[in-house]
């Protein structure tokens, strides 16, 4: 299976997004007795028209991790879609807020409150303008660099959460940024996109263990081997 075909399979396998507002925290009985150690959040906008935009690569990463590690099907909860699973023995809740990017933090806060987790238990996967396309870096805390999803998350939970920065590059002109981040990945970029998502999913156990340096190193090695 080629990387391009793998990416298509990933998107074809995603659970259908049910129209209407997803369930909020009080309706989170969908989670059953699951008690995650960590909450991993993919940032993006809900709906098919946004699915392949650069701004949605956080959603893509969450889907890739869930599919690669055999997470349970998505359930409506916390104003988003949540999937339960384990990575390297660590219980993880993968969350895709369905609140649209500008209000992502509300969904994250709801999940944190429900499971009584701290900001240090949260990892956010997001698109990063200030990183070359398909490069991956991890940092703890920091600013928002104008990213509305990060800004909303910070407003609701503070800024000391871990970020997995998924490089999309910069168009070179600040006036072109909005059109660029809301633009779809080109067909010619699909193999590189699939390679990045596959590497992030394959090395996710290092994130679960808190070894960010090893995660970044092994992802970089995988991507170098794919060049």
Predicted regions and their residues:
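Short, loop-centered acidic/histidine patches that primarily coordinate divalent metals
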Residues: 166-169, 185
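Nucleotide and nucleotide-moiety/phosphate-recognizing core
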Residues: 2-141, 151-164, 171-176, 191-226
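Short glycine-enriched, charge-decorated loop/helix-capping segments at active-site entrances
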Residues: 137-143, 181-185
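Hydrophobic alpha-helical segments within soluble ligand-binding/sensing domains
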Residues: 145-149
